[in-house]
């Protein structure tokens, strides 16, 4: 076929009004460019005068091409199994001309009848062959004189010149965006106003019928576009195209500031705003700004409470589709992201990139004040607030201030009592999502953070950091009153209350106040009388699981914690810590009434009851009251029948285990109470106290 016999109708593509609506604004603009180029190519190659088609006239005037009314017979594509972007909802694709049907069907049958005689490469369309053949000509590359840019094809040069020469006189009054054609401006205007296409499933509205069609696929689970490499399917062709670059590894878009490369141009544009600091999309409610418009849209739903994306499994709603997709992987078990180091798979890219061990993390962001380094710049920024002391976020309920807005929001849940994050396993609720995530590891047993010193594993990184201080002996949090050091800040906060006398946790039943929330929790069980934790050996019940565990060691007789000074062994690590203070002579807890000092806060609390005459532990048999619970337990054995605690050495029986322990010293010769004046030792504290009067 000679080029002279080609007409514009052979290389033009026609759209009906319905077809035109399926196209996005980008696709419409591309169509206009291609048609104008095809016409220019035809004029250039034909070598004689070609009459200007109506389609070109309309495009030059900025009118929409579907307005042309043709008389030709209509044809239709019957390949309903195709993955053609335009075909949707099971409808046939209609064409006005049989020639257009023939060209379209080559997409499905793979037919490429036009072959290059130079290199034997085949093409579906004659115009593609014509453009390709210019590669083999000996012509010098075409160059734009204005920009000194060279092109291998004349069509590429013409396209470049049109882009740079074209005026854009049509400006949007809403956002100021400019367009070359009024039709493009009219189409763009719908962004700000019309959304005539509404989804009957969820009520979400769209500007075009095509957007609605694509949206329907999410409800029906339709994913017609499948990757031939890995089999993953997508509901939109564009997502398949983006996905395929994962397999090729191609990242053609490079940042000219830092050299980082991206698979998509959109990804590069978003990245570049990091360097410029530009955040053009601002929320009118709270003033927060975003780099991407989609992030602003998602953020606005926080104010409106809208959660349009609902999980069909559990009914949970989400503000954006990505959150729903991540959530649904809980049920499907999908884990698309695999670590090349150890083969471990993850359900999200964030989990994959999150550090598994502290060794693997690069920390390029260093604080100039203290030298601490961070893997993420945002963490450095937050850390620097510690040095500046600024706390700009104040709670309007209690006046407490915070460095971070997120910390304020979490704090406010204390006043509202809101705990929106609930565990599906046990029903326990949390005020923070992170706390729920950590809690979930109790059920799964997942402990990814391992200590290199002793091999002990932990559910979260912060627990490991605190644990490592046992090996290093580091106590970075120091009390300014007494100089005592602590391994983490929470212990220092509680310790300070010893000096200030602050007791913020009050019992609503009796008005008693406590310095630690855990003490209040323990105290409340006195009023309820509940003892839900029962020993399976002897049937004894306890209010707390920790006390039950301590009790069970009696049956096992195991004492794994040994004192390095004297060799004495203990069932609990805390007991060993308290015992160590005996050797060190450390008594940091002082009574404000009489000045007596104690090695443990609990001993001070019990001692203070002497001054207040507080005896909260009452015997239900005789009504006698005691300062501490252990005295009550010992007393209750008086009412019990028999003496259940028998000495294995001599057979003597006692009412309580405490009395038996004291008796054992007769056989062992143990005298733990030493006089600091003359170094004489005694079996009982009371005998030591009598002895010390000699030295007064």
From Swiss-Prot:
GO terms for biological process: regulation of transcription by RNA polymerase II. PROSITE patterns: KRAB, ZINC_FINGER_C2H2_1, ZINC_FINGER_C2H2_2. Keywords: DNA-binding, Metal-binding, Nucleus, Repeat, Transcription, Transcription regulation, Zinc, Zinc-finger. It holds the Pfam family zf-C2H2. GO terms for cellular component: nucleus. Coiled coil: none annotated. InterPro entries: C2H2-ZF_domain (IPR050752), KRAB (IPR001909), KRAB_dom_sf (IPR036051), Znf_C2H2_sf (IPR036236), Znf_C2H2_type (IPR013087). SMART domains: KRAB, ZnF_C2H2. Its main location: nucleus. GO terms for molecular function: DNA-binding transcription factor activity, RNA polymerase II-specific; RNA polymerase II cis-regulatory region sequence-specific DNA binding; zinc ion binding. Signal peptide: none annotated. It is found in: Nucleus. SUPFAM superfamilies: beta-beta-alpha zinc fingers (SSF57667), KRAB domain (Kruppel-associated box) (SSF109640). A zinc finger (C2H2-type) spans 114-136, 142-164, 170-192, 197-219, 225-247, 253-275, 281-303, 309-331, 365-387, 393-415, 421-443, 449-471, 477-499, 505-527, 533-555, 561-583, 589-611, 617-639, 645-667, 673-695. PANTHER family: FINGER PUTATIVE TRANSCRIPTION FACTOR FAMILY-RELATED, ZINC FINGER PROTEIN 519. This is Zinc finger protein 607. It comes from Homo sapiens (Human). The gene is ZNF607.
């Amino acid at each position: 076929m000679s080029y002279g016999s080609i007409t514009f109708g052979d290389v033009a593509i026609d759209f009906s009004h319905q077809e035109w609506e399926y196209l996005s604004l980008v696709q419409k603009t591309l169509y206009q460019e291609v048609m104008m180029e095809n016409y220019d190519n035809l004029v250039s190659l034909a070598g004689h005068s070609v009459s200007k088609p109506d389609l070109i006239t309309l495009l030059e005037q900025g009118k929409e091409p579907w307005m042309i009314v043709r008389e030709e017979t209509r044809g239709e594509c019957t390949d309903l199994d195709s993955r053609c972007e335009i075909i949707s909802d099971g409808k046939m694709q209609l064409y006005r001309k049989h020639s257009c049907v023939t060209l379209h069907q080559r997409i499905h049958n793979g037919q490429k009848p036009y072959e290059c005689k130079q290199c034997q490469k085949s093409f579906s369309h004659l115009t593609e062959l014509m453009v390709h053949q210019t590669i083999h000509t000996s012509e010098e590359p075409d160059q734009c004189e204005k920009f000194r840019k060279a092109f291998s094809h004349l069509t590429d040069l013409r396209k470049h010149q049109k882009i740079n020469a074209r005026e854009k006189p049509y400006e949007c009054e809403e956002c100021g965006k400019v367009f070359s054609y009024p039709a493009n401006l009219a189409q763009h205007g719908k962004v700000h106003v019309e959304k005539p296409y509404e989804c009957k499933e969820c009520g979400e509205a769209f500007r075009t019928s095509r957007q609605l069609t694509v949206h329907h696929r999410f409800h029906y689970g339709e994913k017609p576009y499948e990757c031939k490499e890995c089999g993953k399917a997508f509901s939109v062709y564009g997502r398949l195209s983006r996905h395929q670059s994962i397999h090729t590894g191609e990242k053609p878009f490079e940042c000219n500031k830092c050299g980082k490369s991206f698979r998509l141009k959109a990804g590069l544009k978003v990245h570049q705003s990091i360097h410029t600091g530009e955040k053009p999309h601002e929320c009118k409610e709270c003033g927060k700004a975003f780099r991407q418009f989609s992030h602003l849209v998602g953020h606005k739903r926080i104010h409106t409470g809208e959660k349009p994306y609902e999980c069909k499994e559990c009914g949970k709603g989400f503000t954006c589709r990505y959150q729903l997709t991540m959530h649904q992987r809980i049920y499907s078990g999908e884990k698309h992201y695999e670590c090349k180091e150890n083969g471990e798979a993850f359900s999200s890219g964030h989990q994959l990139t999150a550090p598994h061990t502290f060794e693997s993390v690069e920390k390029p962001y260093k604080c100039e004040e203290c030298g601490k380094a961070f893997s993420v710049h945002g963490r450095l920024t937050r850390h620097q607030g510690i040095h500046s002391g600024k706390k700009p976020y104040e709670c309007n309920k209690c006046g407490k201030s915070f460095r971070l807005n997120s910390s304020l929001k979490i704090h406010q849940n204390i006043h509202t009592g809101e705990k929106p994050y609930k565990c599906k396993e046990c029903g326990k609720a949390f005020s923070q999502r992170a706390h729920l995530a950590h809690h979930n590891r109790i059920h799964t047993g997942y402990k990814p953070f391992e200590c290199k010193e002793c091999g002990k594993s932990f559910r979260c990184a912060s627990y490991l950091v605190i644990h490592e201080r046992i090996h290093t002996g580091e106590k970075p949090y120091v009390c300014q009153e007494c100089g005592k050091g602590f391994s983490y800040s929470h212990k220092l906060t509680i310790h300070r209350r010893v000096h200030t006398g602050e007791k913020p946790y009050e019992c609503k039943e009796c008005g008693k106040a406590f310095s630690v929330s855990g003490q209040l929790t323990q105290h409340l069980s006195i009023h309820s009388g509940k003892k839900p934790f029962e020993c399976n050996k002897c049937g004894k019940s306890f209010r707390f699981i920790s006390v039950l565990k301590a009790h069970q060691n009696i049956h096992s007789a195991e004492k794994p914690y040994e004192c390095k000074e004297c060799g004495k062994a203990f069932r609990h690590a805390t007991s060993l810590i308290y015992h160590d203070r005996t050797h060190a002579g450390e008594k940091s807890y002082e009574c404000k009434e009489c000045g007596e000092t104690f090695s443990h806060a609990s001993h001070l609390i019990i001692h203070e009851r002497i001054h207040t005459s507080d005896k909260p532990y009452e015997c239900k048999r005789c009504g006698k009251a005691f300062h501490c619970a252990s005295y009550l337990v010992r007393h209750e054995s008086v009412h019990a029948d028999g003496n259940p605690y028998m000495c294995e050495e001599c057979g003597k029986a006692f009412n309580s285990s405490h009395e038996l322990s004291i008796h054992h010293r007769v056989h062992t010769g143990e005298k733990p109470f030493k006089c600091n004046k003359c170094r004489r030792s005694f079996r009982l504290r009371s005998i030591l106290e009598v002895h010390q009067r000699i030295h007064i």
